[in-house]
Amino acid sequence: MSISKIAKLAGVSTATVSKILNGKDQAISEKTRQKVLKIVESEGYIPNAIAKSLKIKNTKTIGLIVPDVMNLFFSELARGVEDSADRLGYSVILCNTDNNSDKEKKYLQVLQSKRVDGIIISAVESNKNICFSNCITPIVLMDRDIETDKPVGRIKVDNIGCTYDATTHLLSKGCTNIGFISSDTTNVLSRDRLKGYIKALEDNNMPYIEAAVYLKDYSIETGYLGAKKLLDNNKIDGICCGNDLIAIGAIKALKEKGIHVPKHVKVIGLDDIFISSYFDPPLTTIKQPIYGMGHEAVNLLIDMIEKKETNLLRVLNHRLVERMST
């Protein structure tokens, strides 16, 4: 069903139909307006959003690219983006890269071809060569310190501060041999989390022992394997984990060895994904405002789309959430 067909059925011009559909019908009689709207409803007319966007130069659509939508961190982040975008009248196209830099590049191209107004991206950790030079669409980077060849918005937390505070908390609980399990240091985020752990040890006159560190990725399996390895070689009484999934895996390994958490080994995570409070034991963690990060990313992106004067870097606060694992 086209506008011309509606106009023919209503016995009016296409210009009249267009004005009614776009709310610019002040000079049109109520009788004519109701007649056109009745035909529109009965015929199931759906406006061509892409064609309309070519005239008004926007699609009211934003793209969201995440590395792993199955990771509860990114699920909550995506919800924050979607809810905030919806309140502002925007739709969201979600793209999952599976931590694949080639898919990431493809999705950047696809989203631009769909004429999205802006893109929010949590880039693949290992993708050091991500290039935005050919991307005219406004971009906001989520929690990633990546050098870019064009100005982009950035939403961050203080990753050094997160693990510094986590390690300091374990020390305050009497831990003297603290292990660290996290992702490998191929990106700034992971390097900063390791730095925070080391700095906390140094500031408290505790030795940094390389054998007490296990680095792989941000998965439950990493926590499980890492805890088993640390226990084989060290008298660990505390474990600082790079995220909550790692902490959950570590606690599973400890339980299998008959080690009580927190009596014998205390464990702290990072993120505060929703399952952390329901785990056994409920997980002490450093809370990142995950949902709020999504909300703030949308606000920043809209400011960029509307070409408002704005600070392109926004650093959000973290805080300790103490539960039963420490």
For each of these PLM feature ranges, what is it?
Residues 176-177, 208-212, 260-266:
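Short acidic capping loops at alpha-helix termini that bridge into adjacent secondary structure
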Residues 228, 233-326:
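Flexible loop/turn connectors
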